[in-house]
Amino acid sequence: MSNKLEQLRKLTTVVADTGEIDAIKKYQPEDATTNPSLILKAAQIAEYAPLIDASIEYAKAQSNDKAQQVQDTCDMLAVNIGKEILKTIPGRISTEVDARLSYDMEGSVAKARQLVKMYNDAGITNDRILIKLASTWEGIRAAEILEKEGINCNLTLLFSFAQARACAEAGVFLISPFVGRIMDWYKAKEGRDFEASEDPGVLSVTKIYNYYKEYGYKTVVMGASFRNIGEILELAGCDRLTIAPALLAELEAAEGEVVEKLVDSKGAAERPAPMTHAEFLWEHNQDPMAVEKLAEGIRNFAVDQGKLEAMIEAKL
């Protein structure tokens, strides 16, 4: 019998949640996802030094203003890392918009267009890029605009059913509902461990997946943020799963049958009317975990973006 990673690939598109080229070469995922924390981590790897130097050189040619140079270097570094990753995968790279723009629709759209132009100027076409945005109301509206321009989006930091519904109604290409971070919250609150089959994060993604398929939404569901392979295996059959290298290694080393847990019902039920802004805020606010985790996720990505900027500024 093949290992669990090989079996999982037959049921689900496997994506690597990393900016590290060596890990991507080793596990040969279809796609890869990055975020500000992963870019910061990758920027500290020696083999990426030339990419940082090239990004600084680009930024200095764009502007004499140091603050602008820092911004441009960070953007170009994310794109340069994305370009390197694209050499080793057949699919798409997800590159994230600055988390500090999470409540700024116009700013998010402008930054997304800028990142896509950087990729396009390097010969990378839109069908190989996903722009990551936080699943705030403003982020979802930004994605709605971008999708109409042919820029596909990956809506991340998704914790509530309201966020998932709003994303589908906006016609976004893909969502990344988080699993492990939801489980973390309930584990801390209830002071207990969860079996994978009753893991609150697993149940959340399962509910979202089944809802999308029941109403025939085309938005891709890509489970993210895993704490163990049990969570991953409970979501076998999900459209895509983005998995960190350590858990890909565990799956590769594990033997035993992988059972399909999520099955596309191929439904075509009449869809409810799209949520209003007020309805979205009300429904999202009914979920204390989601409110807390969305805010925390944005703050943490912003902190890592700040660390990356400080590192770049020291090199300018």
Curated annotation (Swiss-Prot):
Entry's Gene Ontology BP terms: carbohydrate metabolic process; pentose-phosphate shunt
Localization: Cytoplasm
Active site: K132
EC code(s) of this entry: 2.2.1.2
SUPFAM superfamilies linked: Aldolase
Principal subcellular localization: cytoplasm
Catalytic activity, reaction form: D-sedoheptulose 7-phosphate + D-glyceraldehyde 3-phosphate = D-erythrose 4-phosphate + beta-D-fructose 6-phosphate
Pfam family, one: TAL_FSA
Pathway note: Carbohydrate degradation; pentose phosphate pathway; D-glyceraldehyde 3-phosphate and beta-D-fructose 6-phosphate from D-ribose 5-phosphate and D-xylulose 5-phosphate (non-oxidative stage): step 2/3
Cellular-component GO terms for this entry: cytosol
UniProt keyword list: Cytoplasm, Pentose shunt, Schiff base, Transferase
Gene3D superfamilies named in the record: Aldolase class I
CDD domains on file: Transaldolase_TalAB
Gene Ontology molecular functions: transaldolase activity
Function of the protein: Transaldolase is important for the balance of metabolites in the pentose-phosphate pathway.
PANTHER family in the record: TRANSALDOLASE
SUBUNIT field: Homodimer.
NCBIfam families: PRK12346.1 (NF009001), talAB (TIGR00874)
Family of the protein in this entry: Belongs to the transaldolase family. Type 1 subfamily.
Protein name in UniProt: Transaldolase
Native source organism of the sequence: Vibrio parahaemolyticus serotype O3:K6 (strain RIMD 2210633)
Gene name as annotated: tal
